[in-house]
Amino acid sequence: MGVEIETISPGDGRTFPKKGQICVVHYTGMLQNGKKFDSSRDRNKPFKFRIGKQEVIKGFEEGTAQMSLGQRAKLTCTPDVAYGATGHPGVIPPNATLIFDVELLSLE
């Protein structure tokens, strides 16, 4: 349970997000069956969120916080750190495990 991180391509191995910093990422979110539900890449606009402010689901934040600058990783988030039993009506079914392809582009 929680978030599992699998590196796709390594980052610098030194620069990690700190609480209060803004992470600038590109991501694609998918259900376990591979169905894409969201992608900053498709919009061609990086997504920003602040670490420690609960602006994203817990698994996304916990996973990104363990990535180093420039890293691209697959984050597998179990329902307890995603949308849980409620899901996100019309988009995420209840008790769904979510998979994100995340690239940490920069920190602000």
UniProtKB/Swiss-Prot annotation:
This is Peptidyl-prolyl cis-trans isomerase FKBP1B. One of its GO terms (molecular function) is FK506 binding. Its EC number is 5.2.1.8. It comes from the Eukaryota. Belongs to the FKBP-type PPIase family. FKBP1 subfamily. Residues 20-108 form the PPIase FKBP-type domain. The lineage of its organism: Eukaryota, Metazoa, Chordata, Craniata, Vertebrata. Has the potential to contribute to the immunosuppressive and toxic effects of FK506 and rapamycin. PPIases accelerate the folding of proteins. It catalyzes the cis-trans isomerization of proline imidic peptide bonds in oligopeptides. SUPFAM superfamilies: FKBP-like. It catalyses: [protein]-peptidylproline (omega=180) = [protein]-peptidylproline (omega=0).
